[in-house]
């Protein structure tokens, strides 16, 4: 009886968190029908409905939410303990989940982790591409990647890249039809390409600094994206002015396909950091990932210059 209840409770947690029987069944490695029977059996024994089912999704009822809050974290703790036990084997193993943007994943994380993954075949890395401010604890990520000045103070932050500079660019065709902005405030008169935060839903404000002067501009335009490659493509097509870390525009600036403006309003600032909660016993796999990504600034350099 106890074993059956534990299996059914695990099934319930998976469905409640995933929001669909399809994803939950795939996660648990069972059929959807078996999963549905498990949930129905649990509800029958408890004599209370735990899930509300629609044609598109599944969500916990008030009773289901209460049960999920009571047991969900306990299953996570059990899984974490089992992962630590598996780490006692000769080779580090386990899955490391990281949330980050797609550009930094393609250009920095994957190249740095490639030698590690080839050397340790039992280590898995799962990337969640997201530009929002994810709660890595609530969403059960091992770590996230953000620019250094946006990380909460209670997190451990490990530098994984050099200081960065933002860039304001547009295609030559755009500037042929519109005057170049001379100050950040001029951007309000331009067609700017916006990015929407995936977590909060708001638009990113464009932030500028010149010596001790800070300017924060809420721009407007015809296009809004939630990933940076789309913004680069739109700028190349002449559809407006874009604002991103300069490395995302670098090859196009060098080739003359994008022109840069307001350069003296875009100083260097702390670059990308891997951040994670202060944990007592990181797994060997996670420690290896952190070491592989860690950036060491060349001696004699500072954020303000080389």
From Swiss-Prot:
One of its GO terms (molecular function) is sequence-specific DNA binding. It holds the Pfam family LysR_substrate. Keywords: DNA-binding, Transcription, Transcription regulation. GO terms for biological process: DNA-templated transcription. Residues 21-40 bind DNA. Transmembrane segments: none annotated. Residues 1-61 form the HTH lysR-type domain. InterPro entries: LysR_subst-bd (IPR005119), Tscrpt_reg_HTH_LysR (IPR000847), WH-like_DNA-bd_sf (IPR036388), WH_DNA-bd_sf (IPR036390). May have a role in the regulation of oprD expression. Belongs to the LysR transcriptional regulatory family. This is Putative transcriptional regulator. It comes from Pseudomonas aeruginosa (strain ATCC 15692 / DSM 22644 / CIP 104116 / JCM 14847 / LMG 12228 / 1C / PRS 101 / PAO1).
């Amino acid at each position: 009886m106890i074993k059956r209840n534990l299996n059914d409770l695990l099934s319930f947690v998976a469905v409640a968190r995933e929001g669909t029987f399809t994803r939950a069944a795939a996660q648990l490695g069972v059929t959807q029908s078996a999963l549905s029977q498990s949930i129905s059996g649990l509800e029958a024994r408890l004599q209370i409905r735990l899930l509300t089912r629609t044609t598109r999704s599944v969500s916990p009822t008030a009773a289901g939410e209460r049960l999920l809050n009571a047991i969900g974290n306990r299953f996570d703790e059990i899984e974490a303990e089992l992962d630590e036990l598996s780490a006692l084997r000769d080779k580090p193993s386990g899955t490391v989940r990281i949330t980050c943007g797609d550009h930094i994943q393609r250009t920095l994380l994957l190249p740095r982790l490639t030698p590690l993954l080839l050397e340790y075949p039992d280590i898995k890395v799962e990337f969640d591409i997201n530009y929002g401010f994810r709660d890595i604890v609530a969403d059960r990520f091992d770590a996230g990647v953000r620019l250094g000045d946006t990380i909460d103070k209670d997190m451990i932050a490990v530098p994984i890249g050099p200081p960065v500079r933002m860039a304001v660019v547009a295609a030559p065709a755009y500037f042929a039809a519109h005057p170049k902005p001379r100050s950040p405030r001029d951007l309000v008169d331009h067609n700017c390409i916006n990015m929407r935060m995936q977590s909060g839903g708001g638009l990113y404000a464009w932030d500028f600094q010149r010596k001790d002067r800070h300017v924060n501009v809420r721009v407007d335009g015809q296009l809004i994206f939630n990933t940076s490659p789309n913004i680069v493509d739109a700028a190349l097509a002449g559809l407006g002015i874009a604002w991103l870390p300069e490395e995302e525009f670098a090859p196009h600036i060098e080739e003359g396909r994008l022109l840069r403006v307001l350069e003296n309003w875009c100083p260097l600032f702390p670059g990308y950091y891997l951040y994670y909660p202060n944990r007592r016993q990181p797994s060997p796999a996670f420690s290896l990932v952190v070491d592989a990504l860690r950036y060491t600034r060349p001696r004699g350099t500072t954020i303000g210059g080389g």
